[in-house]
C-alpha cells in the first residue's frame, strides 16, 4: 500500500507541475525540468509529444504500474491518472488510459 501512495504522490506533483509548465509555454520534458525526483525503488519515464505528456511509473516490486497523462485538447487541459498490470502498446491516444487499465482520482491533500 505504501508503494501505491508513493506512486500517487509522484503522479500528483507531476500533473501539477505540467499544468504550470504548460501555462508558461510548453510541457516539461523530464522530472528534473519540473524540479522533481523519484525514489530509487521505481522506474520512471516521461514522454512528451506535441499536446500530450505522460509520466510512467513502474515500481520494482509488484505488478501494478501507473501513468499520469496531461493533454491539451485545443481548448483546455485534460488530466488522467491510470493504473494497470498489462503491458501497453506504443500507440497512445490523447488523454485515454491504456487498454485494460483503470482511471482513478488522486485526492488533493
Where are the model-predicted features located?
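Amphipathic alpha-helical segments typified by the pilin-like N-terminal helix
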Residues: 1-22
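Periplasmic/extracellular, small/polar-rich flexible segments of pilin-like filament-forming proteins
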Residues: 23-109
Amino acid at each position: 500500500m505504501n508503494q501505491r501512495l508513493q506512486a500517487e504522490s509522484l503522479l500528483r506533483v507531476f500533473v501539477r507541475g505540467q499544468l504550470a509548465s504548460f501555462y508558461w509555454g510548453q510541457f516539461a520534458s523530464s522530472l528534473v525540468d519540473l524540479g522533481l525526483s523519484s525514489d530509487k525503488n521505481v522506474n520512471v519515464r516521461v514522454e512528451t509529444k506535441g499536446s500530450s505528456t505522460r509520466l510512467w511509473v513502474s515500481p520494482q516490486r509488484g505488478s501494478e504500474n501507473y501513468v499520469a497523462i496531461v493533454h491539451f485538447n485545443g481548448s483546455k487541459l485534460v488530466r488522467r491518472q491510470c493504473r494497470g498490470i498489462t503491458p501497453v502498446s506504443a500507440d497512445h491516444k490523447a488523454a485515454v488510459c491504456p487498454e485494460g487499465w483503470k482511471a482513478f482520482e488522486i485526492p488533493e491533500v
